[in-house]
């Protein structure tokens, strides 16, 4: 690793900070990517990430991995019953979480580290429920985020796809990367069996709202299931599509 990883706390919220190799406080601000579920998507991807920097496939990025206090509450937009006796109900505190991140957490990051404050360079990425709430970030705060990565987003969540469909979201200059495995949800008996279908519905809704091929990507990975190793692989793909100079439809 040529950059650095460090643990921090802002208020009650813990986060992992990745600073790229050329980071300094003297140069212009670096694009900042706010990542759900702490460093789980990138802690084992740093070598690949820095290779992309070195090969100029990506500009150097600052990654901020935000630890959730309770992901079943903070990554869901409204309450819903649990799908299993093994888990508690979904708390539906997602809008409160997004407000806290947008109005409290991000300003603290921008005051203390050399990251650009330009919305078009500010990104948010997550996987599973983290991918769902990342998409809702652009619905709630469209002028705040210019890059959204929704990896295997939980669009099976009750009324999530429908809410996105009827929303007043307009594309503006934002770019949105979505991914899903072709086998996700296939063995589920609950509403999670609709993972692939609901993801395609959301993608179609965004196209109907005016998102062009240059602004919207849906990557369907053949044979992939809903698993962390596929999330991590798509994380690098998401960054390269959202921020890379040689973006293409995957």
From Swiss-Prot:
Cysteine disulfide partners in this protein: none
The name this protein goes by in its record: Uncharacterized protein YbbA
PANTHER family noted in UniProt: ENTEROCHELIN ESTERASE-RELATED, IRON(III) ENTEROBACTIN ESTERASE
Classification of source organism: Bacteria, Bacillati, Bacillota, Bacilli, Bacillales
Gene3D superfamilies: alpha/beta hydrolase
One Pfam family this sequence matches: Esterase
Induction and repression of expression: Induced by Btr in iron-limited conditions.
Source organism superkingdom: Bacteria
């Amino acid at each position: 690793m040529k950059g650095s990883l460090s643990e921090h706390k802002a208020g009650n919220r813990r986060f992992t900070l990745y600073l790229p190799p050329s980071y300094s406080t003297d140069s212009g601000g670096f694009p900042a990517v706010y990542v759900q579920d702490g460093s789980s998507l990138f802690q084992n991807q740093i070598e690949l990430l820095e290779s992309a920097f070195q090969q100029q496939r990506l500009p150097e990025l600052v990654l901020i991995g935000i630890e959730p206090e309770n992901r079943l509450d903070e990554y869901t937009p409204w309450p819903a019953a649990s799908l299993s006796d093994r888990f508690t109900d979904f708390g539906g505190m997602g809008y409160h979480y997004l407000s806290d991140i947008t109005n409290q957490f991000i300003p603290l990051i921008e005051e203390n580290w050399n990251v650009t404050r330009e919305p078009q360079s500010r990104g948010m990425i997550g996987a599973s429920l983290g991918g769902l709430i990342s998409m809702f970030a652009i619905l709630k705060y469209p002028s705040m985020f210019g890059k959204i990565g929704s990896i295997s987003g939980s669009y099976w969540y009750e009324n999530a796809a429908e809410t996105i469909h009827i929303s007043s979201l307009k594309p503006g200059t934002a770019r949105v990367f979505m991914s899903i495995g072709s086998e996700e949800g296939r063995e589920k008996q609950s509403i999670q069996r609709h993972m692939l279908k609901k993801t395609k519905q959301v993608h179609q809704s965004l196209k109907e709202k005016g998102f062009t091929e240059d602004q919207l990507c849906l990557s369907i990975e053949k044979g992939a299931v809903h698993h962390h190793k596929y999330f991590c692989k798509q994380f690098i793909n998401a960054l390269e599509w959202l921020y890379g100079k040689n973006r293409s439809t995957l």
